[in-house]
């Protein structure tokens, strides 16, 4: 019986594994992809414009060649960190189910609900009452495509890339339509359309324009004019180069009303004022965000709500425990939308979990 199963080996999962090892917990990390899989899926050569202390797990360890690290440097740092600290991470293993063991089998007592777990927001502030536990046994069975694990606690340390959002228009199923952007070189001198209003869409448009693609960014005017980082604007270090590309006629901007249809060799768009335009086209990147897969959490009884970037699990912001006792959450699929928040959450969560386990073991020993 493990103390903790961690699902996901991104910054949150790596940080949690490190803290678990430092605090003497028995644990395992299960990752369906690679170490730092979300970062691996960043565009090739991307510069990560966060400050170094927001990206590193321990201060002073990340040493990029320039002021900001590239995707490759950040990925290498996380992989090196895992290897140097001999963290127990299993990659390319997919979790297929998480079940709460029946109390009769686990020998645990189910607490009656104490109160309703309420999470309210005032701007960026989050306040909450302690969670009302939805039963459970404090013991869980985690099933993967390669084995079965038993643990008293489970931490979902997930990203939010499971379900890319769709336009739901005719022609979106064509092979030339992508829901992610990796690199520019296949699209040099091609007619590229990027649909989206966030940083990912802005970066893709910038890279393609700089590398010689005939590039059009289709964006809502409100998204283009938005300068509020809290509202998901295109960051200034992407926006300024985009404006330069516009001035040099290397990039075209289309203020979007909606996408009408994607066809072989062209795309039909409707402008913000209702005019329809047909653009010659070779490739379309639909970069309008993505959502996490919350199915397993919901099956366990975890409550969800609408967060900053979509549906998120409800959790205590002080302990990161959900309304289901023993189920914790951290990472980009929560309201911690940045890497620093994902890294810092386990630094709070794991010491509290250690304290809880120590008290429980002492009680059982009497």
Stretches found by the model and what they are:
Residues 5-7, 149-161, 195, 280-289:
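Short hydrophobic core segments
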Residues 11-87, 206-236, 305-311:
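Beta1-alpha1 glycine-rich phosphate/pyrophosphate-binding loop at the start
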Residues 70-101, 108, 136-162, 260-266:
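Feature captures the FAD/FMN-dependent oxidoreductase FAD-binding
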Residues 86-99, 139-142, 212-307:
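A Rossmann-like FAD-binding core segment of flavoenzymes
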Residues 135, 358-366:
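Short, low-complexity, charge-dense intrinsically disordered segments
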Residues 158-211, 308-318:
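Glycine-rich dinucleotide-binding loop and its adjacent helix/turn
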Residues 173-186, 290-338:
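FAD-site-proximal beta/loop scaffold in flavoenzymes
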Residues 330-357:
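A conserved FAD-binding loop/helix module that cradles the flavin
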């Amino acid at each position: 019986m493990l103390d903790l199963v961690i699902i996901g080996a991104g910054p949150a999962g790596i940080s949690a594994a490190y803290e678990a090892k430092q605090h003497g917990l028995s644990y395992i990390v299960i990752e369906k992809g690679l170490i730092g899989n979300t970062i691996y899926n960043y565009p090739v050569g991307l510069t990560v414009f966060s400050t170094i202390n927001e990206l590193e797990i321990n201060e002073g360890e990340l040493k990029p060649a320039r002021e900001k690290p590239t995707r490759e440097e950040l990925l290498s740092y996380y992989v090196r960190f895992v290897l140097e600290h001999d963290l127990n991470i299993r990659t390319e293993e997919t979790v297929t189910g998480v079940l709460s063991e029946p109390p009769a089998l686990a020998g645990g007592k189910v607490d009656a609900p104490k109160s309703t777990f309420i999470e309210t927001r005032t701007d960026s502030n989050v306040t909450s009452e302690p969670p009302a536990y939805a039963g459970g046994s404090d013991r869980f069975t985690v099933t993967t495509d390669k084995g079965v694990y038993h643990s008293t606690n489970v931490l979902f340390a997930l990203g939010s890339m499971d379900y890319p959002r769709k336009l739901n228009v005719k022609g979106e199923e064509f092979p030339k339509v992508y829901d992610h952007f990796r690199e520019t070189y296949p699209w040099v001198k091609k007619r590229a359309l990027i649909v989206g209003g966030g940083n990912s869409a802005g970066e893709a448009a910038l890279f393609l324009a700089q590398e010689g693609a005939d590039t059009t960014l289709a964006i809502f005017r409100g998204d283009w004019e938005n300068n509020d980082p809290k509202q998901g604007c295109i960051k200034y270090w992407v926006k300024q180069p985009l404006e330069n590309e516009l001035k040099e006629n290397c990039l075209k901007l289309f203020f979007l009303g909606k996408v009408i249809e994607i066809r072989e060799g062209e795309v039909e768009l409707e402008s913000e004022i209702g005019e329809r335009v047909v653009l010659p086209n070779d490739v379309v990147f639909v970069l309008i965000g993505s959502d996490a897969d919350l199915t397993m959490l919901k099956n366990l009884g975890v409550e969800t709500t609408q967060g900053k970037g979509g549906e998120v699990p409800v959790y205590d912001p002080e302990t990161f425990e959900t309304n289901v006792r023993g189920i914790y959450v951290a990472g980009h699929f929560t309201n911690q939308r940045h890497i620093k928040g994902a890294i810092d959450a386990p630094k709070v969560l794991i010491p509290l979990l250690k304290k809880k386990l120590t008290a429980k073991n002492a009680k059982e020993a009497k």
